[in-house]
Each structure stands twice: as structure tokens, then as C-alpha cells.
Amino acid sequence: MMVDFFIAYRPLFDLFLLHTGYALGQYVVLRSGTFSIANAGLTAIGAYLAASLTVKLGLPVPVSILLGTLVSILVSMLLAWPLARLRGVYQAIATLAFVQVVLSLNIYAERLTGGAMGLSGIPKAVGTWTLLISAVVAIYLVACLNRSRIGRAFDAIRQDEAVAVSLGVAISRYQLLAFALSGALAGFFGSLEAFHVYSLEPNQFGFPFLVAALSYVVLGGRHSVWGPVVGTAVLVALPEVSRPLADYRMLVYGLLLILVINYMPRGIVDTWIDYRKNRRRVRSSEQQEKAPL
């Protein structure tokens, strides 16, 4: 029974693992106070480059994945330099333009990417266990990052840049690091997806992908590392759960996001953490009041 259940929902579980990596990449850059949505473009770079190196040049899959990840890191660091001069909505517009440039290159660079027809004939060298191990390691590394001096610097920059500067935090340096880490996650998991799905299409990393990666973090929460994981689980499972609604599934998707943003603006996980802290605080104060003098 359990085996049949796992076989039936294995593609959904694989999708969850891949998108957990994408959500973590988006989470890292947002936590540093940078409103970047460039991860869709960085993911496309990692996926297409890794697949092309193996399909066109015959490189081994691990080497292609490594090179796809490294190039995504390099591009993300080059992108961070001009973005350091921008803030807020201007960062979002600039990174959206970057994504559009990458998607256009995917269509017009036919020799490398296969053009509008996409890239096919990719060997399926990445299975569920590889995705699971990669996702678990990524969660662990991001959790360690949050507890480190780098994570505290990210928090300071996000909350108030002026205060962060007064504390000696080099904003440009830490935002560059955030872009590099985000690019590493995007490029690595993009490369894994390339060797998991047999083929790539230009629209695979387009606007819906961009919105999904951002929604995972907004829905789950932007403070705890479990925020993007929970957000990914909810939104990946939602189409399957709401399948009986047929054409109304996207309506349910949108309404859920609206409700969470209105009533849980900090996200599901962060709201739950705040609730638990408040409960403990109230319980502690009640015990102190009942304690004999």
C-alpha cells in the first residue's frame, strides 16, 4: 500500500524537493534585504548550461552540474554589482529585465539551447535520492548560515541599512555574498532538474516559475529556514489537493495567497513561531502571578 502510494506521488515529491532548493535560493537573497527576482534566470542558466555541456560536448553529468553551478554563481555576482546602487522596486524591475534577457537568449541561441523547441535528449541521471539528499543538505547549510555572523548581518541589513552601517556591516560585501549563495542554489538545483526531466523548454523558467519561487517564501515566511520549505510544500501540493475543482484551481491558489498575506503577513511558519512565543510568555507570566510571595 505504501509502495503504491509512493510510486503514485513520487513525481510530486520530486517536484517538491527541486522547488525547495529554488525557494531557499530566493529566501537567502530576500533575507539580505535585496528585492531580487533574478533566480528564475540564474536557474535557467544553470539548467541549460549543464544540459548543453553533456548533450553537445559529452561531458560527464557531475562535471556539467558543477560548471552550471559555478557559472550561475559568477553571473549572480556580476549582477550584484549594478544592483548595489538600486533599492526596492528598482531592484525588482532590474532583475526582472535580467530574467527576460536570459529567456530571450534561451530562444535565440538555438545552437546551444535548441531555441523555441527546447533542448531534448538529456540523460536522466538524477533520481529521487539525489534530490532528497541535495534538499536536506541545502536546508542544513541555510540553517547554519542563519545562525552565523553572516546571517545576523543579513538581518541587520534587511531591518535597517543605516543602523547596519553604523555597526560596521559592509552592506555591498554581504549583498554580494547573498547573491552568490542564491545563485549557487539556483544554478545547482536548475542543473539537477535538467538531468531529471529529460528535456528543457524556454518557458520552463518563465514568469510562472518566478512568481512561484517568490510565493513559496512569502507564504511560508521569511525568517525561519522552514518558511520556504513549508511554503513550497503547500503550493506544490495545492494543485493536487484541489484537482476536483478543475478550472478553479488557480483561483484557489490566488485566494490562499491573499488570505495569508492579509491575516499572516509574516508567513505561516513565522506566524506560528510568534504564536508559540506569545503562549509561552503568557504562561510564564501566569505562573509568576500564581507563585506564593
Describe the role of every protein-language-model region.
Residues 1-293:
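Transmembrane alpha-helices and adjacent helix-loop boundaries
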